[in-house]
Structures are given as structure tokens and as C-alpha cells.
Amino acid sequence: MAAARPIILRFESRNGQFRLSVSPQEQFPLLQEKILENLPKDVEPSSLVLSNKPIGTGGQERQLKDLAGVSIERVGLKHGDKLFIGYQDKQASQAAPAHKHVTADVSRRLNGAPVPETETVTFHPPTSPSATIKNPWEVVQQSPLDDMLDKKDGKIYRPRDPKMCNHGPKGMCDYCMPLEPYDPKYLAEKKIKHLSFHSYMRKVNATTNKAELKSSFMPPLNEPYYRVRRDCPSGHPPWPEGICTKCQPSAISLQPQEFRMVDHVEFASPDLINSLLDFWRKSGAQRLGFLYGTYEEYTEVPLGIKAVVQAIYEPPQVDEIDGITLHEWPNEKEVDEVARQCGLEKVGVIFTDLLDAGRGDGSVVCKRHIDSYYLSSLEIAFASRMQAKHPKATKWSRTGRFGSNFVTCVLSGDEEGAITVSSYQASISAVEMVRADIVEPSAEPSVMLVQSEDDDTDNKSRYIPEVFYRKINEYGVSAQQNAKPSFPVEYLLVTLTHGFPTEASPMFSASTFPIENREVIGESQELRHVAKKLVSHGDPDKAIREVSDFHLLCFLHSLSMFSKEEEALLCRVATTHDPTEGLKLLNTPGWATLVTVLQESGERPPKRPWLNPADPPRPLSQQGKRHLSSRPESPKSESEQLAKRFKGASLE
């Protein structure tokens, strides 16, 4: 049998590239001498590593000495294929641990200063920008609202202008032709400060995918990435051992964001705000709650989106006069599941920042205004983390996600001393800067600090790119400023509008059940409160009405008395108020179990009221006489009578 023709294999190391002519039947350990001839003289032969990808980027790295008996053709290498080589020099191999394959031939350096080898270097794990999705418009599942807005043309139609239009009723000219949803003149005329998300997407898409170019479609949206790329193709060791112009982030130029992911926040009922304010009125401490609701179309803005808040859940927290400390929320997933069965999702967060003015008229101090701040640097960092936890899925982004619909609301005093709601979102750049650990909150609430690479108190090796922003200087000229050490928080903020519906029709009609995690002011959720709300006294409609309370639903879920089907029925009754579904609920085994638990715990419905002695005696019917007994009842018969009376309250 004739010998196989030799092939050319390409090799790349951090010292450069070279080629070798090898036989397909040749085994890998036999290549060691040829490889060492093309490497520096101080290379430790036993440290040679081969990989199909650059060293340190997640490829299949194998020690050359471990490939004994493995031929080149066995692993499928062909003529012209490329392999990557990693190695240690002899001095480094003597000092380094045995399991460490690759180290830099120079000491680790951070901002020019050497980093000790014993130091643990931590990285932020979020996905690299290279993790793009092939054809995201076919794979990514958007929300039904986004799909509906995508199908709309978004044009702003104008009537015929009788003064400027010289054509007939079926004609069209520049004065009456439809406008794009991102038309700047229309936005200025309607005093719309920010583009809606779908308007911005169409504006970017118009420049990215021009019809006249007839090129393949490219997703127009791409989130910023301010971290060192972990998958650099240059072949050097990963950061902080090595860095190049391909993997280091570019300088950041901050500017106000021209669009917003959500345009409006609508509270279904003023009672939602009043219940949160009641805690501050009773304790004087601040309070935080998460907003549960839905996203709907907002017609006041072209292709707009609004968050409709239906419930506020208050997680475990420690409240003080000047701040809030959030504790671990152990039942967060359970609350999210109850909200999901009600057709809701977590749409935002709201917190108070109130201080009584001391006038005795209910007025509060105005802390947030144009000369101070609207959202502090600490609050922006908190909002950024919340938005990073709730990304928005969209098929118009290369990574399948872009921004977040999560909103942040503040209850504080205005210039007139009244309590008002303000709604905000952190910008896309703010979320990425917080994720990349580039900025940190300041003691001065109106400014954000830029991290320093020299600050290694947290044992982190971070790369901080240059950050710039533009401002009007003392000469009235827009000049670029270096953001170090701090810059105004307005560059990281997007304002939203808010309001209440003209005719309130909240999803949950009842709001008298105690709110969770309020033991500090003497309010707690107990079984007696359940009995008080659900006892119908012969009126089943009362129980159906009173079950429409989000806090009651969460409490009943924690009791684990209902099956999944019964709990879904319970949530449907609470949200739709359907009497037919309500009667089905009252006859389920789970409801009977609830009645039994209330009975055995002593939480029984109140007895029928005693007759006033001044009232005339009521005649006793023959049916009632049959229930009378001349002998005293045994404890057993008494409990049976109480059970029958409780059953007659139409709880089941």
C-alpha cells in the first residue's frame, strides 16, 4: 500500500505562526521536536498544549504528551487545518501549579502595576457579545404586544390641509402624506420627549437595512458591551494576562437616550398608592413594593407601550426614615406564579421617599427637583440591576434581547408639598455600566462615580474604559468632558409619564385583606382575617367578591390547600368575577379543606346577633321548634351544630 501524501498543518502560538509538513499517519508526540524548533528555546517540552481554538477561549485543549498513539488522520485533520499551541517557559513551569497549562511570559499587570499570582481574579459572567443568535426573527419568542405592534405600519396619518393642499380628495402631497412614527417635527409639536421603542427600532432599521441596497437582513438592534471580550480571536492569554485592541472596549461617550422602552405607567386604582402610603403614615418609615401588572398599547404615543399596574406586593424589608434594606425574598417564585395565573407579571418597583413638612396639613418636603436630583445614583444602580434581571426578548436584536420593560416609580413630594408619583427607567448604557462594574453610587446623590482600576479592595482586576460626556461650559459651548471621577446622573436616566384611568376598573375589586410583611406596625395575615373576608352568611356572592384580592390569593397559595386546577380556578374567579366560576370554586375539595382548617383552628364565623330585649319577640316556626331539645347537648353534638352552622355560611 502506497504511503499517504504529506499534508500541511498550520500552527499558531503567542509568538507567531508557522507551518509543518506532516504525514496523516504520524502520531502527535512525534511532532514535538518539529514544534519546539519553531518556539523559543526556554519552552518546557512537557507543557505543550494543542487546541482547535485560541488557548483559553473554551476550545478542546489537550496536552501533547497525552496524545500518545493518536494519529493526525484519526482526529480528522486535513490539509491546511490550523491548530493553536500553548506552553510554559521553564522558569514559569517550576513555579506554577501542575494543572496550569498556560501563563503569560510576562507578569500580570493591571493599569501598569503587577498583579500577584496568588490573587484570585474574578470576572462578571454575563454573556459575551459574540453569543449572537442565528436568524433571531425565527427563533426568539416575543410578547403578544410586541408582535401586534410589529404588524402595524406605525404611520401618522394626516388629513388634507385646505390651505396648503391643491389636489383633490384622493390625492396626496408633502403637506398631508403620512409621517413616520419617529418624525422629529411631529414629536416636537406633540411635546414627546422620547421615541417609543418600536419607533426607535424602525428608525434604526431604516438606516441598517436599506431597501435600495438589496442586501441580506441584519437585526438593527445591538446592546452596548463595555467589558473585555473573553473570546478574542488574537490568540493571546485572556484578560488580565493579555489584552489587545480587538478585545478591549472602546471609549464610552455618554449622551441622553433618545428612546424609552416603556412610555407610560398607569395605576389601575388610586387605592394601590394609598395602601403603600398608609405604611409611611403609620410608621414614618419608607416602604418598597414590586409592581405586578400587564403591558398594553399606549395610543398617546406612536407605537407606544404602557405598564398597567394591578397590584403591589411588599417583600421582606427593613424600613427606616431615610432608607430601605431589602431582605431575602424566599417566596418570590410563588408570588410570581400566582401573578402568572392571574395574567400578570412583574413590571416594576415603587418606593417612597417622604418627609413630613411639620405644618400639620399633610404636606411633605420637596427633596427632588431640578436643582438637586430626580433619581439618586444609588437608585439608578438599583434600577439598573432590576432591569438587567428582567431583559426584554425581541427578534430585532442580534442577541435576542434588548433593554428591559422594568420601570421604577418614586413617591415623593413636589414643589407644592403634595405627594406625587414619578416614573423612570435606567438607560441602556447605565445597565451595561453597572453590569460591567464601571460606575458606583456616590454619597452625593446627583453624581455617579467612575470606578478606578487602582482600587483593588474587592480583589477584582477590572478594565475601565475612558468615559466622556458633553456639557455646556461657562462660554455657552457644548464641550466634551472626562467623566472621571464623577458625572451627573441625568445621562443615565429616562423619564416616563404616569397617571390613572378616567374610569377605574381594577382587576382586583377587594382591598381589605392585610398586606404582607407589615408586622412592624402591628398588621399580620392570619386565618381569622380569611374567615372575616370569606364568611358569606348565606350570600355566596360575597365570598366570590372578597376573593378578588391579590394579597389574599398569595396567602391562600402559601397554605397549599388547593390543587393546581383549583388554584387556577381561584385566580380566574378573582380576576373575572364570574359567578358561574365562583359557584364551581365554592364546591371544590380545596375550598372544603379551607373551611375545615378554619373550623379546627377556631376561626369560625361570628354567631348570629342576639336579639335586643327591647325588640318584640319573634315567633318561632314549627321547623325551629323541632330543633329545640330539653336536654343539654353533649360536646359532640355541640360541635356538630357549629359545623352545620359554619357549613350554612356558604363557604364550600
Curated annotation (Swiss-Prot):
List the source organism: Neosartorya fischeri (strain ATCC 1020 / DSM 3700 / CBS 544.65 / FGSC A1164 / JCM 1740 / NRRL 181 / WB 181)
Q: Which family does it belong to?
A: Belongs to the NPL4 family.
What is this protein called in UniProt? Nuclear protein localization protein 4
Q: Where is the composition biased (Basic and acidic residues)?
A: 633-643
Q: Where is this chain primarily localised?
A: cytoplasm
- Compartments in which it is found: Cytoplasm, Perinuclear region; Endoplasmic reticulum membrane; Nucleus membrane
Q: Where is this region: Disordered?
A: 601-652
Summarizing the function annotation, the protein's role is:
Involved in the import of nuclear-targeted proteins into the nucleus and the export of poly(A) RNA out of the nucleus. Has a role in the endoplasmic reticulum-associated degradation (ERAD) pathway.
An annotated GO cellular component of this protein is: perinuclear region of cytoplasm
Q: How does it sit in the membrane?
A: Peripheral membrane protein
Sequence ranges assigned to domain MPN in this UniProt record: 265-402
Alphabetical list of Gene3D superfamilies matching this protein: Phosphatidylinositol 3-kinase Catalytic Subunit, Chain A, domain 1
- This protein's gene is called npl4
